Amino acid sequence: MVTNGYDYTTSFLESYVNAFGKDPSNINNVFKFSRTWYNELARRNSDPSYEKWRVNNRNVYEYFGNTNWYDVFYKDYTTGHQHNISVTGGGDVASYYVSGRMFEQDGIYNAGDEKYQQFNVKAKGIVNVKPWLRVENTTDFMYRYSPQPTSNTGISTTPMTVSRMLNHQAYPVALVTNPDGTWTEAAVYTGWAGFVEGNSWRKDRKFDMNNRTAVTIDLLK
């Protein structure tokens, strides 16, 4: 993964010029590009003592960063815990088995409280109706819950997932915040700003149920 802003921009520029025969006006559709800015990026890349931002003559922030957006979003590790319980019983005529599982994993992001939770219940019963007739029924339930950050940017009427916007708007050359503490466009468009502030996310819930019934007839009894 390329996290050096100059290397990333140079590769993008070469690809764009080879494809279209001219310089781009933007990197993708948001981040402004010009040769003047690119030359300044090269100068600041060669001397780490320079700031990774400046205010241009239009009083607009320009960025010259080396941001690893995956480090911004994701934790290095996470933890989880699982609990299981089962009950079984019965006799010659009928028997049963019931099990339950609860799994919870801490969030993978550096912001928000998006723990993943999953609950499973399985129940199985067997009834020997006759020596030659057996009926079995098995039912499974599974419930999953996970909140996820999203990006509401105006680019699409549908909120975009973080993974999509990281590919689209997380330029290494961009910074996360401005010197005055405000969010950069990249932080807003990737969804990071909204997720940190708690106003841009979705809750994914899914419930599954399966039921299976089997009848066994032994014609030899």
Give short role names for the model-derived ranges.
Residues M1-N66, F103, G107-N210:
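Surface-exposed loop/interface segments of Gram-negative outer-membrane beta-barrel transport/assembly proteins
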Residues V2-T3, V72-Y74:
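C-terminal beta-signal and adjacent terminal beta-strands/loops
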Residues K75-S95, R101, A193-K221:
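Outer-membrane beta-barrel transmembrane strands
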Residues Y96-Y97, F119:
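Aromatic side chains
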